[in-house]
Amino acid sequence: FDSFKVQTPYCYRCPLGKNREECSIDCLGAVEEVLKKNAGEIAAIVIEPLLLGAGGMIVYPVEYLKGIWELSRKYNVHLIVDEVATGFGRTGKMFACEHAGVEPDFMCLSKGITSGYLPLGATLTTEEVYKAFYDDHDKLKTFYHGHTYTANPVSCAAAVASIDLFKSDNSLENAAVINRSLGSFLSGMAELSFVGDVRSIGVVGAMELVKDKKTKEPFGLNERVGLDIYKRGLENNLLLRPLGNVIYFFLPLCTKSEELDDIFSRASIILSGG
């Protein structure tokens, strides 16, 4: 499909040159401009809610997500949210959309639906969209979307077991505990000369490494700083996965306090060059 793209709401490297204190979510203007000019051609807006994963674990303001939803209503286009990485408690709520009170037209789910034990994906939609394809067979309105591994029983069993855990334990409460510990650790790491930005939401945290803290100059692609830290982590029995110049944590909801202490203690030693 043809698509239109707008700049990422990236607060640390704001394309409008603003900082968090003076931000009024002006970056929504670029989205509205595209919608104004092309609303008749646009079927939907697709977005990762609150956390841009592969882009560098970029956490953006709740107001931006809410603004996107309001624009989708204003210009009568569907809103599709990709909760593959953010769903099932990763941001501190069951789904990231809840932080902004957003009700999307489509929600894409995977990963956490089975706690990662088996592959499974799901697409949720509204009653209105469902009814658009619901009619007598001879009306030819059916959306034929089946595929070979639909409703794989083993994956579905894993999903049911995973969802049952949310009903029976305190996973979301534990996410808040993890976030406090993660935030405290990241605040300490922010003092390092090569850490330009730290950000977190729920059980996800990230540090953006820079060559120059004042100018925000990034390390060059060939310097492989993230890879060096990853290798040092392995030597200390800790997996610190880099995304370019970003080192991030994607912690399980069941992580215990003593495990957090161990993880952050090892990470501090590795990042401090110990």
Where are these regions (language model features)?
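Conserved N-terminal phosphate-binding loop of PLP-dependent enzymes in the Aspartate aminotransferase
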Residues: 1-274
